[in-house]
């Protein structure tokens, strides 16, 4: 299993599954920050120390298997081309920060559900991604990977403070739990403007699709905990679970209200966006995200039939600049990317609809 295995498909195998509440919650993520006890933090360690971390993971964890999760393979960042690294970021397998780490690495499970980032902000960052609303399941998997690593690594841990991390905001549990949610109706009704400040007051933070500093394009929001100290892992996950459940309910109510009061306007918006995606000859990534959001809403409300939301998950990744260029075989100028993106969307939508039509005719 090589790097090519992880960059050739837009959809990770876990993304092809339908999780609970997947019309609103695209994915659930658990991330655990850990550090070696006897090695200085990445802000201060030497090149030799950084290299020793990668080497230990290559020797002791690469090509090893966890029951129920699968085999892992180690990818060194300095072995990957810039475009390949960008694709891994766009698939949410690694962070943008890791791509800039000269001694960075990533231990990836075959199904891409688990990634262990090495020499990022901390020595070790365990990430588990599950489809739909499955925070508790993701937490269970993260703990399993954490225990597996701890069998061979002594973690930096303090009885009073918990796990020690490079950034003080991660000290304690070292846990970041997050859900990625598609909230178009709350945006359309502008309820999101009062909901975000209320969420922030609960010790949670709302970000865009690629985390800190990113914009919520395509009405996709990432909601995560901010506090890691003074609360148990279970409390952190349960608090986020509770808020996400309320958001699901509010989004469903807003969708129902729009459908009941502005059905024609909503259908017009959905079909216009579908028309753009089906027929455009050039399209930028931001407009693509907006149109994909409208079409996804149309599918979820039964306005558009014969189109799977899975195709939209695929297009979300496939139309990002890195994947688009990787798919096209090399670097593209911005206008070339817009032309290629439009062609790719048309091809995939027409292929999907034709496949559905043939399926219906054969029944």
Swiss-Prot record:
UniProt KW keywords: Allosteric enzyme, ATP-binding, Cytoplasm, Kinase, Nucleotide-binding, Phosphoprotein, Transferase
Instruction: Kindly summarize what the UniProt induction comment says about this protein's expression.
Output: Is repressed by the transcriptional regulator CtsR. Forms part of an operon with ctsR, mcsA and clpC.
Domain called Phosphagen kinase C-terminal: residue spans: 24-254
PTM comment: the record says: Autophosphorylated on Arg residues. Phosphorylation on Arg-40 and Arg-86 are up-regulated upon stress conditions.
Binding annotation for ATP: 27-31, 92, 125, 176-180, 207-212
Q: How is its activity regulated?
A: Appears to be allosterically activated by the binding of pArg-containing polypeptides to the pArg-binding pocket localized in the C-terminal domain of McsB. The McsB kinase is inhibited in nonstressed cells by direct interaction with ClpC; upon heat exposure, the interaction of McsB with ClpC is dramatically decreased, leading to McsB release and activation during heat stress. Its kinase activity is counteracted by the protein-arginine-phosphatase YwlE in vivo. Requires McsA for full kinase activity.
Entry GO CC: cytoplasm; extracellular space
Q: What is its EC number?
A: 2.7.14.1
GO MF entries: ATP binding; creatine kinase activity; kinase activity; protein kinase activity
Swiss-Prot/TrEMBL catalytic activity: L-arginyl-[protein] + ATP = N(omega)-phospho-L-arginyl-[protein] + ADP + H(+)
Give the subcellular location.
Answer: Cytoplasm
Enzyme class at the top of the EC tree: transferase
Give a Pfam family name.
ATP-gua_Ptrans
- Per the Swiss-Prot or TrEMBL annotation, the motif RDXXRA motif of the pArg binding pocket involved in allosteric regulation is positioned at 337-342
What top-level branch of life does the organism fall under?
A: Bacteria
By its UniProt entry, which CDD domains does this protein fall under?
bacterial_phosphagen_kinase (cd07930)
GO biological process terms, alphabetically, are: phosphocreatine biosynthetic process
Query: What are the Phosphoarginine sites (modified residues) in this protein?
Result: 29, 40, 86, 190, 255, 269, 272, 346
What is seen without this gene? Cells lacking this gene show a defect in the delocalization of competence proteins that is not related to altered expression of the com genes on the levels of either transcription or translation. Inactivation of mcsB also decreases transformability. CtsR is no more degraded.
Oligomer status and interactors: Interacts with CtsR in its autophosphorylated form. Interacts with McsA in nonstressed as well as in heat-stressed cells, whereas strongly interacts with ClpC only in nonstressed cells.
What does the sequence similarity comment in the record state about its family?
A: Belongs to the ATP:guanido phosphotransferase family.
Chain's role: Catalyzes the specific phosphorylation of arginine residues in a large number of proteins. Is part of the bacterial stress response system, where it is involved in regulating the global heat shock repressor CtsR; phosphorylates arginine residues in the winged helix-turn-helix domain of CtsR, thereby preventing its binding to DNA and consequently inducing the expression of repressed genes. The transcriptional repressor HrcA, the chaperone GroEL, the unfoldase ClpC, together with several ribosomal subunits, represent other physiological targets of McsB under stress conditions.
The protein here is known as Protein-arginine kinase
Per UniProt, what is the name of the gene that codes for the protein in this document? Answer: mcsB
